[in-house]
Swiss-Prot record:
SUPFAM superfamilies reported in the protein's UniProt record: Flavoproteins (SSF52218)
Enzyme class: oxidoreductase
Molecular function as annotated in GO: electron transfer activity; FMN binding; NAD(P)H dehydrogenase (quinone) activity
Superkingdom of the source species: Bacteria
Enzyme Commission identifier(s): 1.6.99.-
Gene3D superfamilies named in the record: 3.40.50.360
Keywords: Oxidoreductase
Keyword Oxidoreductase: yes
Protein name per its UniProtKB record: Uncharacterized NAD(P)H oxidoreductase YdeQ
Species: Bacillus subtilis (strain 168)
Protein family membership: Belongs to the NAD(P)H dehydrogenase (quinone) family.
Gene that specifies this protein: ydeQ
Length: 197
């Protein structure tokens, strides 16, 4: 895959008051081959347009789910979106293979410091453990779950750190080699060109 189209689903119930998610959203708006879709902006007061959402998914290779971590999960609209858009027979079940091979990236802003998300830490579990439902969902619908992007200390992070985070975020979600299979293919091509004689 030399060319990749990315869909960023922004799921923040109050993006204007957000420091991190708002900056991340602004940072990716000007990126080529990236579509930004704010779910609360579109669906705060109206039903989810399932057909539109499914067409958006079909038109992109990588799907980024961007949200603040609330109660060890996503804001409620994302759960509703999954329930309505990942339909039986379309995303999973017999004939439900429309998302097979697409890539899934979870991007989260997290209020507490990273050390609080580990065994023995304040929150007891790592972010990888807490995101198991997303990993399982990606697996069920045939998507490749890629490394997440997380920014900790969302409540105390400085403006400079947020700007740096936005730059790292853009690089992370647009890095085609975030998928280890793509990186492996590049390495194999390089090996083919090496003259071992």
């Amino acid at each position: 895959m030399d060319h990749m189209k990315t869909l960023v689903l922004v799921v923040h119930p109050n993006i204007e008051s957000s420091r991190i998610n708002k900056k991340w959203k602004e940072a990716v708006l000007s990126e080529p081959d990236v579509t930004v879709h704010d779910l609360y902006e579109k669906y705060r007061d109206q039903p989810i347009d399932v057909e539109f959402e499914q067409q958006q998914l079909l038109a992109h290779d990588r799907i980024v789910f961007q949200f603040p971590l609330y109660w060890y999960s996503s804001p409620p609209l994302l759960k509703q979106w999954f329930d309505e858009v990942f339909t039986f027979g379309w995303a999973h079940g017999p004939g439900g293979n429309k998302l097979k091979g697409k890539e899934w990236v979870t991007a989260m802003s997290i209020g507490s410091p990273e050390h609080s998300y580990q065994a023995g830490g304040y929150n007891l579990f790592s972010i990888s453990e807490l995101t198991k439902p997303f990993q399982a969902s990606a697996h069920l619908v045939g998507m490749t779950y890629l490394p997440s992007f997380a920014e900790y200390r969302a409540n105390t992070i400085s403006d400079q750190e947020i700007a740096e985070s936005a730059n790292r975020y853009v690089k992370h979600i647009t890095n085609i080699e975030l998928n280890p299979k793509v990186r492996l293919q590049r390495y194999l091509k390089q090996l083919e060109s090496v003259d071992l004689t």
